[in-house]
Regions:
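Proline-aspartate-enriched helix->loop->beta-strand connector
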Residues: 165-174, 179, 195
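A transmembrane-helix-recognition feature enriched in membrane-embedded lipid enzymes
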Residues: 79-84, 215-265
Length: 265
């Protein structure tokens, strides 16, 4: 893929969703773009957006900056697709972060890309690496690390992590720390640790490592993955899903109204 090809992909596949730049790409197109990024060797960040992250990007200027400068922002949530469709901005494919990670690891095994897993609880990233190397023969996981709680406030620990990543020789970094911590870590450090592609992957390491049970595929396909997570931890997640996330509909109505006034709907 040439620079010209890259610009065509980006310019033709970008949509504005509630003021958030989304790349309207299939998983296969993302994989192909990643190949280009690895060959280019300029550090980039790839992130996904669900309702919770969309609200953070809308309401927090720094998060908006991070997502606006990301190489790819993919849609990781059925509600985002439903709202975008009603705004006459149909999204061609929901790209689930955990599913994308598996596809990326499959391709990494085929193309001899090296990966590094950062995040999750003690031992989880190790188990995830073991499972991935078993499922994708030839995959090279060159390192795993689970940072201690509060690592981002410890300069020595941060220096240790960045040095570890820089010396790893990895082509891709999968970070599972939850948002916004994982997004901020990548954004502020990727140029220093100099790994071509870094991904904010949330709970993907937990799913692959087996520490958290993922929702059945039928629930994910029908936009009910959030409900599965809620049933696993209702006390902690009730406010998030039934109070905080409801604010997305306010922003949706405001955006839709402004688009109608501008004659774009």
């Amino acid at each position: 893929m040439t620079e010209k090809d890259l610009k065509i992909v980006d310019n033709r596949k970008v949509i504005d969703f509630l003021g958030i730049r989304l790349n309207n790409m299939t998983a296969t197109e993302i994989l192909d773009h990643v190949d280009y990024c690895i060959e280019r060797k300029t550090p980039v960040q790839i992130v996904g957006v669900n309702v919770d992250q969309a609200l953070r990007v809308i309401e927090d200027k720094y998060s908006h900056q991070i997502f606006d400068e990301a190489e790819i922002v993919f849609t990781d949530g059925k509600p985002i697709m439903w709202m975008a469709d009603r705004l006459k901005r149909p999204i061609i494919e929901k790209v689930s972060g955990p599913d994308l990670m598996l596809l990326l690891c499959e391709r990494a095994a085929q193309k001899n890309y090296k990966i590094f897993l950062l995040g999750a609880g003690p031992g989880v990233a190790d188990k995830a690496a073991e499972n991935l190397e078993h499922d994708y023969p030839g995959l090279q996981c060159v390192g795993t690390y689970s940072p201690p709680f509060g690592f981002e406030r410890d300069p020595e620990e941060m220096k240790k992590i960045v040095t570890m990543l820089k010396d790893s020789g990895a082509d891709q970094l999968f970070v599972g720390m939850g948002s916004p911590k994982q997004d901020i870590f990548i954004y502020e450090n990727m140029k220093e640790y100099n790994i071509p592609v870094s991904y904010s992957m949330g709970a993907a390491l937990d799913f692959i490592g087996g520490s958290v049970k993922r929702a059945p595929k039928w629930m994910s396909d029908h936009g009910l993955e959030w409900f599965h997570r809620f049933t696993q931890n209702p006390k902690r997640l009730f406010k998030r899903y039934f109070v905080d996330d409801m604010k997305i509909f306010k922003y949706y109505r405001l955006f839709k109204q402004s688009e109608k006034v501008a004659g774009r709907l």
